[in-house]
Design a protein with these regions (language model features):
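Nucleotidyltransferase catalytic core that binds NTPs
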Residues: 2-235, 242-247
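A structural signal for short secondary-structure junctions
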Residues: 233-234, 254-256
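Conserved active-site loop/cleft motifs that coordinate metal ions or position small ligands
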Residues: 238-241, 259
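Single conserved hydrophobic/aromatic residue that forms the stacking wall/gate
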Residues: 257-265
Length: 265
């Protein structure tokens, strides 16, 4: 596996490989990779001749400068994992490489980006679309892989691809969880043992809600989840919504929308 730091060098490598008829898969990440990321990379490797994994902590999607500063950066360990997964390239550019000038583009995909996470983190999804569009333009992948854990982000990226006429396939990949049910996340490294235990109440409540929803109304299910999270130690609920998986708009009945894998962070 090669570690590449500039768009020019990566494009030169990909030009040669495309001339050989190879398809290119892209897995965009911010590093601090774990088994969940590995599942995306392995899927890309199985479906494409070449897999590029970007490792870039994108500053434009952070609302909190402290969160940006504290985000784990583990490039050496990330590269070892990527090599084990069979990736061809780790693309690890600098901020200056990706943003030689400030990106003033405004992406608006309302109502997809104005509800839930969009309401609590204004500007976040605009930053996500900025960097993802830059990666698509630079790499021109045939397929790009995103985890369903960030389900709202996945829906927004699908809409961006549709509106901007990108000629690629967006592949959503299932959530990967610890044995006890906690969804894998790079930020889990920042949790204390007690905070991690508290976080388990999120996935436990969501799995309970899946069964609960089969015999209760949307409002009853909403109330059950809200009360369970508020009663759990160390947790404060920001939002819980039951929505259509494509439009992210609230639904009147959850019977058609119950899923074997509740989406949570």
């Amino acid at each position: 596996m090669k570690v590449i730091h500039t768009i020019k060098d990566l494009q030169a490598e990909l030009t040669v490989l495309r001339a050989q008829g190879k398809k290119v898969g892209l897995v965009p990440t911010m590093g601090a990779l774990h088994v969940g990321h590995a599942s995306l990379v392995k899927r890309s490797v199985s479906e494409n001749g070449v897999t590029v994994v970007s490792v870039f902590v994108n500053p434009t999607q952070f609302n909190d400068k402290n969160d940006l500063a504290k985000y784990p950066r583990t490039l050496d360990a990330d590269c070892r994992l990527l090599e084990d997964c069979g990736a061809a390239f780790a693309f690890a550019p600098s901020v200056e490489e990706m943003y030689p000038q400030p990106d003033t583009r405004e992406f608006s995909y309302a109502p997809l980006d104005t509800v839930m996470e969009g309401a609590f983190r204004p500007g976040h999804f605009n930053g996500v679309c900025q960097i993802v569009s830059k990666l698509f333009d630079a790499i021109q992948p045939d397929r790009a892989y995103f985890g369903e854990k960030d389900f709202q982000q996945l829906a927004i990226i699908r809409e961006m691809v549709r509106q901007m006429n990108y000629k690629l396939e967006i592949v959503g990949c299932p959530i990967v969880r610890e044995e006890d049910g906690l969804a894998l996340s790079s930020r889990n490294k920042r949790l204390s043992a007690q905070e991690r235990e508290n976080a388990l109440n999120i996935s436990r409540t969501l799995f309970k809600s899946r069964t609960f929803a089969t015999s209760h109304t949307v409002s009853e299910t909403q109330k059950m989840v809200e009360e369970a999270i508020e009663a759990a130690p160390g947790l404060r609920l920001e939002y819980f919504e039951i929505v259509d998986g494509n439009t992210l708009q609230k639904v009147n009945s959850c019977l058609l929308y119950t899923s074997p894998s509740p989406r949570d962070a």
